[in-house]
Regions:
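PRPP-associated nucleotide enzymes
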Residues: 1-127
Length: 127
């Protein structure tokens, strides 16, 4: 199942599907953020029982990973199978330890840096 982690990604996913003229199953999610502190306080997955299906969260950037960890925890409550993360830009400013608790694998490009970590699989950008 393809997972869109927040309202911004939901819009991008819908636009992509419109441009392709297809709709691939999409699980939409949302979160609440305190705009003055930046603290995330609530995550919601708009799906029922996922019956052990694998889930791939897709977004543009992962810095600290709090959004993705919160969404992964909610997906687990909905009986998701293995959970994967794909981001174009992987910064991982807090490391990957917390991500290893929630994701089977994380995929990203080397647009930010080359990363040596068993959890991370990078795709090299060739210019």
């Amino acid at each position: 199942m393809l997972v869109s982690p927040d309202s911004g990604a939901n819009k991008k996913s819908n636009k992509l599907f419109d441009n392709l003229g297809v709709f691939l199953g999409l699980i939409k999610c949302d979160k609440r953020r305190n705009m003055s502190t930046g603290e995330l306080s609530f995550f919601e997955v708009f799906a029922d029982n996922l019956y052990g299906k694998p889930c791939l969260i897709v977004d543009d950037i992962c810095d600290g990973g709090r959004t993705f960890i919160g969404i992964a925890e909610e997906l687990k409550k909905k009986n998701a199978g293995d959970i994967y993360l794909f981001v174009t830009h992987g910064i991982f400013s807090y490391g990957t330890e917390e991500l290893t608790k929630n994701f089977k694998k994380v995929f990203c490009t080397n647009s930010f840096s080359d990363i040596k970590d068993d959890l991370i699989e990078q795709f090299k950008i060739i210019i």
